[in-house]
Amino acid sequence: IEVCDWSSDVCSSDLKEGLRIGLPSSVQQCAISLGLIALLGIVNSFGTDTLTAYGAAGKIDTIIIQAVLTLSGALAAFCGQNIGAGHLDRVRDGVRFAMLVNLLLGLATFTAIYFFGDKMMLAFTKDPEVIRIGKEYLLIMGGFFIVHGGLNVFNGALRGAGDTLFPMAVSITCLWLIRIPLAYWFSSIWGRSGIWWAIGASLCIGLTITYIYYKIGRASCRERVFWVV
């Protein structure tokens, strides 16, 4: 076991680099948790059936999204290794492959929800009204699974390049300045379904902003590798 002298410049720089990469992700998760509590308050205003349906459908949604999050994590490691090795073509190909997998997953998931969404809800409740509301949520959100997955793919590539600050900023901005205000506004016009559409709209805006940032190649202070994707 090698004991590091924390007074050395090497360990100090490593610690700073670790904090620079890891701290934004921690802040992001805290902000997201608080934002979801605020969103839950809007959902709760539509009654217990809507709240129950949102909770049950949200569990299904979370299970589905885990596949994309796993893909994003794998891509981050892949990009980090290949950027470090100077294999920039592999980074480009890896992102393209991840987007293809995301597309196939999104289409398969939406198809499954369209035909079996109500049966998925039966795993959590037998209340017909709750099942109906839950399937409504899943159908609307299912239309945005590819968008959500694409956002996570690009975020994975950015994190692999060492840029965790930008994904954090976009995530917090889209949640607190876009999703929650839109949820209030849309729900006042279209009722509870407006909340689901607000979530989808915030994902689209987040993907657009992230893709532009990714495309112009400002992902990190290292190599401008992303513009070729």
Cite the ranges covered by each PLM segment.
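Membrane-interface helix-loop junctions in multi-pass transport and translocation proteins
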Residues: 117, 123, 132, 175-208
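Single conserved hydrophobic/aromatic residue that forms the stacking wall/gate
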Residues: 1-10, 219, 223-229
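Multi-pass alpha-helical transporter architecture, strongest
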Residues: 203-224
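Small-residue-rich hydrophobic transmembrane alpha-helices
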Residues: 54-117, 148-170
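Hydrophobic faces of transmembrane alpha-helices in multi-pass small-molecule transporters and flippases
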Residues: 11-38, 63, 67, 71, ...
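Short membrane-interface helical motifs at transmembrane helix boundaries
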Residues: 108-131, 135
